[in-house]
């Protein structure tokens, strides 16, 4: 089967098969002390993150050094992204996360900034989210790296930031599940769209090949499964 890039995954290195951009956790706060989640989806994801965190500690390898000591511990042959997720953002940890992020982006194995973005269901105030998101836009531009975006109910605010900065680097909306009309709006604004396991078929069908990415994110599926699913929806064959 054709090799396909998994542009955004939370899988461990051993499960990513060496063809993924692994989201590198900036756990400057223990998951036990992260801001309270406002909805069920966030709460479930937070629980899974805590489970992964404890699993890393028990295994004593992989990302454990980074999680325990905030030092870079990547494996040769793998590539990463790092960003300040709005779910994990709070006044008490914002500066620490930013400093840690700036340090990680100096390593060549980091090939993207993110996931970063805006989320009106997150506990962090929107003003703080905007401040930290803009700082990550600046880091994306400084390092010449694409920005992987998390956006929930904040499209207008996101577009306003894009208009303000006029970024030269690619902005990739990850886990896109919107309607075709929203997809067309974002495509006209220069966005790339990344699709995971769930999305409206008609939306996937509207995105041109050159603006389309695929991802596993938190899915149990492999990227090959995501590719085959997308191929069926788009009516093409996988070589």
What are these regions (language model features)?
Residues 1-239:
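Mid-domain alpha/beta scaffold segments of enzyme catalytic cores
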């Amino acid at each position: 089967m054709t090799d396909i890039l998994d542009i955004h995954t939370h899988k461990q290195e051993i499960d990513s098969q060496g063809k993924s951009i692994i989201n590198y956790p900036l756990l400057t706060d223990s998951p036990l002390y992260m801001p309270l989640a406002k909805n069920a989806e966030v709460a479930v994801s937070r629980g899974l993150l805590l489970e992964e965190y404890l699993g890393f500690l028990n295994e004593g390898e992989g990302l454990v050094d980074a999680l325990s000591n905030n030092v870079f511990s990547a494996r040769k042959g793998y590539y990463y992204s790092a960003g300040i997720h709005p779910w994990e953002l709070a006044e008490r940890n914002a500066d620490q996360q930013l400093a840690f992020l700036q340090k990680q982006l100096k390593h060549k194995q980091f090939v993207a900034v993110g996931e970063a973005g805006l989320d009106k269901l997150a506990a962090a105030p929107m003003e703080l989210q905007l401040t930290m998101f803009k700082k990550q836009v600046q880091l994306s531009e400084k390092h010449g790296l694409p920005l992987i975006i998390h956006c929930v109910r904040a499209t207008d605010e996101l577009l306003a930031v894009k208009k303000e900065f006029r970024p030269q680097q690619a902005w990739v909306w990850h886990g896109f599940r919107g309607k075709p009309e929203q997809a067309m709006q974002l495509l006209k604004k220069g966005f790339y769209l990344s699709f995971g396991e769930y999305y409206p078929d008609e939306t996937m069908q509207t995105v041109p090949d050159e603006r389309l990415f695929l991802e596993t994110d938190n899915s149990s599926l492999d990227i090959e499964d995501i590719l085959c699913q997308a191929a069926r929806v788009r009516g093409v064959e996988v070589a």
